[in-house]
């Protein structure tokens, strides 16, 4: 109790209730893409099954680590010293998730759309769209991300992005982060193909 220096009537309030403002997560992203592992108990049971994870370590315990990289060309100077390398990798979701946690990320949802492929077309439009549709059943995610889809051709990428925007427009509780293709730095192809529906959610 404080010591008062002047005579007067003082009222002290004693709080019997905890503070009424509770900490609430404001944004929970959902990462949709390919993973090393797609099986937890039965074959493929992690595919298109949104799962909440709290850390990169927990992600790795369910889904495995990132893909192996293929060096397609190494550039050397005249003395034979390494300058740079061209690396081939179609799967970037693991790296995106790692950067998310490196920058203070918290809980998020993971939707595996399949395992890494060693041959054929690495990223399939219909698989990624199915992952986007699967996350619609979960109420918590507020941000949809599908970084692996950026390697699709322009038409297929636009189809996936339109599916995500459609979901955001219907549910009205989430937004989508839409990546541009590497060959479209000014976004001309993106603007031509994305359409006009639900753009405020992207």
Q: Where would I find each of the regions flagged by the language model?
A:
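Surface-exposed assembly/interface segments
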Residues: 1-202
């Amino acid at each position: 109790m404080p010591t008062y220096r002047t005579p007067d009537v003082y009222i002290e309030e004693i709080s019997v209730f905890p503070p009424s403002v509770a900490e609430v997560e404001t944004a929970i992203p959902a990462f949709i893409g390919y993973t090393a592992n797609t099986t937890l108990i039965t074959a493929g049971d992690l595919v298109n099954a949104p799962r909440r994870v709290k850390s990169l370590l927990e992600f790795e315990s369910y889904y495995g680590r990132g893909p192996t990289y293929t060096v397609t060309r190494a550039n050397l100077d005249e003395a034979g010293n390494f300058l740079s390398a061209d690396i081939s990798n179609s799967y970037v979701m693991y790296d995106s998730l790692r950067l998310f946690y490196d920058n203070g990320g918290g809980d998020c949802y993971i939707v595996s759309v399949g395992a890494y492929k060693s041959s054929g077309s690495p990223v399939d439009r219909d698989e990624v769209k199915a992952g986007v549709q699967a996350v619609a059943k979960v109420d918590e995610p507020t941000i949809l991300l599908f970084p692996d889809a950026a390697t699709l051709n322009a038409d297929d990428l636009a189809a996936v992005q339109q599916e995500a925007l459609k979901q955001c427009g219907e549910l009205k509780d989430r937004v989508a982060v839409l990546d541009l293709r590497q060959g479209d730095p000014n976004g001309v192809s993106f603007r031509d193909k994305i359409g006009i529906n639900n753009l405020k959610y992207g």
